[in-house]
């Protein structure tokens, strides 16, 4: 097994001795402006406070630096990004398959599943499959899709409704209505 040097990932902000400017625009711990000071003076102030000097805006003239606890800053940043990820809802397309001869009991079970999908904010794809001689009775399939559409009109809006059969199936896509 080979040993190797562990490559340190580059930090997004330069801190303490990594800052290269001679003068910096300094911001205090509480966000108050301390004016333009020399880098040495800024580093002395951070030593006194026992925290880090972090370069916030390296492209400014002079660069903007802030006195802060860098570890705490990174923790807060990662915590807020995790919160934002939690709030994002990924919309999925859930599929339910019907047949032209789907009985009433099965229809109700599938309808309940569709209602659950739409209430959770997901799109629903209703696939109606035809087998054998069922192809001759496409109007029965259209009746099933129209019934589903009518039963879910309070919860969903139709995104796509089949005008003709594609292969051996008809596909209808429903999207949840926006909540007011």
From Swiss-Prot:
- TM ranges are none
What is a single cellular component term in the Gene Ontology annotation? membrane
Give the UniProt keywords, A-Z: Cytoplasm, Initiation factor, Protein biosynthesis
Which Gene3D superfamilies does this UniProt record tie to the protein? Translation initiation factor 3 (IF-3), C-terminal domain, Translation initiation factor 3 (IF-3), N-terminal domain
Q: Where in the cell is it found?
A: Cytoplasm
Tell me if Repeat is a UniProt keyword of this record. Answer: no
**SUPFAM superfamilies from the xrefs?**
Translation initiation factor IF3, C-terminal domain, Translation initiation factor IF3, N-terminal domain
A Gene Ontology biological process noted in the UniProt record is: ribosome disassembly
- GO MF entries: ribosome binding; translation initiation factor activity
The record's listing under HAMAP family reads: IF_3 (MF_00080)
Assembly and oligomerization:
Monomer.
Q: Which family does it belong to?
A: Belongs to the IF-3 family.
Functional summary from the UniProt entry: IF-3 binds to the 30S ribosomal subunit and shifts the equilibrium between 70S ribosomes and their 50S and 30S subunits in favor of the free subunits, thus enhancing the availability of 30S subunits on which protein synthesis initiation begins.
Protein name in the entry: Translation initiation factor IF-3
